[in-house]
C-alpha cells in the first residue's frame, strides 16, 4: 500500500460492516458504507476490515 497515514497502529479504524476510505485531500481515513461511492477515495477504493 502506498501513501502515508496517521494511524498509529494496525487496528481497523471503522466499525464492522463499514470500510475505510482515504480521501484524496486528506491523510486520515474516513469510514463509510461499502455501498457508498469511492470516487473521492485514494485508488478509488474503500478498504474493508477483511482487506485491512
From Swiss-Prot:
GO cellular-component term (any): extracellular region
What keywords would UniProt list here?
Disulfide bond, Ion channel impairing toxin, Neurotoxin, Secreted, Toxin
Where located? Secreted
Propeptide positions in the record are 1-6
Comment on protein domains: The cysteine framework is IX (C-C-C-C-C-C).
| Role description | Probable neurotoxin with unknown target. Possibly targets ion channels.
Name listed for the protein in its UniProt record: Conotoxin Cal9.2b
Q: Which organism is it from?
A: Californiconus californicus (California cone)
Amino acid at each position: 500500500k502506498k501513501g502515508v497515514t496517521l494511524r498509529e497502529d494496525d487496528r481497523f479504524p471503522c466499525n464492522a460492516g463499514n470500510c475505510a476510505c482515504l480521501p484524496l485531500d486528506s491523510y486520515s481515513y474516513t469510514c463509510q458504507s461499502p455501498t457508498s461511492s469511492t470516487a473521492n477515495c485514494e485508488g478509488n477504493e474503500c478498504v474493508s476490515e477483511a482487506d485491512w
